[in-house]
């Protein structure tokens, strides 16, 4: 059993990465299908979810929302039933393996709800009889980059999380999150399509003419577009990008394009409102009162106010003064939303804009010196599976990882309460100096994370944080 590769899972609110260690990328990236539950926001941080769809209709540019059902949390029995089917699909349909022969490495969100973790452990041990479960927090994403200091910006489906890591230690007091992600882009795209569906955005592919028949347009909208999140995601991925002004401080005009949704019809994607303007929802302006407020504690009262840039700056405000510049030099992007074209440059421009916007703002008073120091950690891997790769590397040195549970210890626990105590809490996973030691040991023996690409593209010009380049294999 020890000779078999471990299974590495990263369960996200929208997609799940699954594969084997010590491979450099997941075998499959599949939708997190926990039907009949729809709990993407719940998986992000324990937020309530609505198990019923909200039907949105459009009538002469008037959008109304019907069927408002109070939100509720899932029960443990519901989670176990959905997780059993979900893991069965992973083991039998994708990874093609026996669950009782493979150790499971779970790369988890640091604030994954405990009820979900308990249900997941119960299903894997009691029904699938896996021999070992190891919990790895997202700070393992530093290991493929050979760094010990980074400002983690994880922008996923339903929220963006910012966590600073300084010399291997997570600064949890500075952790911030905001409900902005690819779901925000999808909702914005839906609103645009609903309000403009009869304004000639549906194109007939045969004669390349706009269709104004409201019955045909609404039928296409409800049957083919709004009910397909994959199609909306594909529109955003293929057509949209993060825009910025040119050197003359003028907006760049973007051409409209046609997106083919079927053999007969296409959608006219507006260049200004959608292609370059859709991403603006991630950087929506905050109230001036928030910018003029010099009380740092007010940032904790309402995390929903602001945008991605202000969330990052609020995180830096919570860090010590000598930590801010090293963190700014080592920004590490995670999540699929950060893979949009132009995301890095737009993020830096928005950070600079917030620092220059108001002379009396707390950002300008305390963080103005960071202008010109926002740099990203360069690496040859994709942002959406970097955390998974960190778990894949750590799977080769499980004897050094303490956040693990064996099947024997779980089944021998005298009560359900004792079993739940075996599951590690997030506050016990904050110090990742252990991960650094594992990386040093691992890179000199079994796996080099750079063996899949050249080392020249890995390190940023700033080396204000420790790197582990001396531990690379020399041969």
From Swiss-Prot:
SUPFAM superfamilies named in the record: Actin-like ATPase domain (SSF53067)
PANTHER family for this protein: ACTIN (PTHR11937)
Subcellular location: Cytoplasm, Cytoskeleton
Originating gene: arpH
Gene Ontology terms describing biological process: microtubule-based movement
InterPro entries: Actin, ATPase_NBD
Family classification: Belongs to the actin family.
Transmembrane segments: none
UniProt-recorded name of the protein: Actin-related protein 10
Pfam families, per the entry: Actin (PF00022)
UniProt keywords, alphabetically: Cytoplasm, Cytoskeleton
Recorded GO CC terms: cytoplasm; dynactin complex
Superkingdom of this protein's organism: Eukaryota
């Amino acid at each position: 059993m020890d000779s078999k590769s471990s299974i590495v899972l990263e369960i996200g609110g929208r997609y799940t990465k699954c594969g084997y260690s010590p491979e450099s990328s997941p075998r499959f990236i599949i939708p997190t299908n926990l039907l009949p539950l729809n709990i993407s926001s719940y998986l992000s941080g324990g937020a309530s979810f609505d198990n019923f769809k909200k039907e949105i209709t459009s009538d002469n540019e008037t959008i109304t929302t019907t069927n408002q059902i109070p939100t509720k949390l899932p029960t443990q029995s519901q989670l176990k039933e959905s997780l059993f089917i979900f893991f069965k699909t992973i083991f039998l349909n994708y990874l093609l393996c026996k669950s009782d022969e493979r150790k499971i490495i779970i790369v988890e969100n640091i604030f994954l709800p405990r009820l979900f973790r308990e249900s997941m452990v119960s299903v894997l041990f009691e029904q699938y009889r896996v021999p070992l479960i190891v919990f790895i927090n997202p700070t393992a994403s530093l290991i493929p980059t050979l760094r010990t200091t980074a400002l983690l910006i994880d922008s996923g489906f339903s929220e963006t999380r910012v966590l600073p890591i300084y010399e291997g230690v997570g600064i949890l007091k500075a952790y911030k999150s905001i409900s902005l992600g690819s779901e925000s882009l999808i909702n914005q795209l839906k609103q645009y399509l609903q309000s403009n569906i009869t304004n000639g955005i549906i194109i007939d592919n045969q004669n390349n003419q706009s269709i104004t028949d409201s019955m045909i347009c609404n039928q296409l909208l409800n049957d083919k577009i709004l009910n397909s999140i994959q199609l909306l995601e594909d529109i955003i991925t293929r057509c949209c990008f993060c825009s910025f002004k040119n050197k003359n401080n003028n907006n760049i005009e973007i051409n409209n394009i046609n997106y083919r949704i079927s053999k007969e019809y296409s959608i006219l994607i507006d260049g200004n409102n959608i292609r370059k303007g859709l991403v603006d929802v991630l950087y929506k302006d905050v109230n001036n009162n928030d910018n003029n407020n010099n009380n740092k504690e007010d940032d904790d009262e309402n995390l929903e106010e602001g945008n991605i840039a202000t969330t990052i700056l609020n995180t830096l405000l919570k860090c010590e003064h000598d930590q801010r510049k090293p963190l700014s030099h080592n920004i590490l992007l995670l999540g699929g939303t950060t893979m949009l074209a132009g995301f890095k440059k737009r993020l830096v421009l928005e950070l600079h804009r917030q620092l220059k916007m108001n002379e009396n703002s707390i950002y300008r008073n305390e963080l103005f010196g960071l202008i010109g120091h926002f740099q990203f950690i360069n690496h040859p891997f994709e942002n959406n599976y970097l955390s998974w790769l960190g778990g894949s590397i750590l799977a080769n040195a499980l004897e050094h990882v303490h956040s693990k549970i064996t099947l024997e210890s779980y089944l021998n626990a005298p009560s359900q309460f004792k079993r739940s105590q075996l599951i590690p809490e997030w506050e016990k996973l904050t110090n990742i100096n252990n991960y650094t030691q594992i990386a040093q040991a691992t890179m000199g023996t079994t796996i080099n994370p750079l063996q899949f690409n050249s080392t020249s593209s890995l390190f940023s010009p700033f080396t204000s944080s420790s790197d582990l380049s001396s531990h690379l294999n020399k041969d």
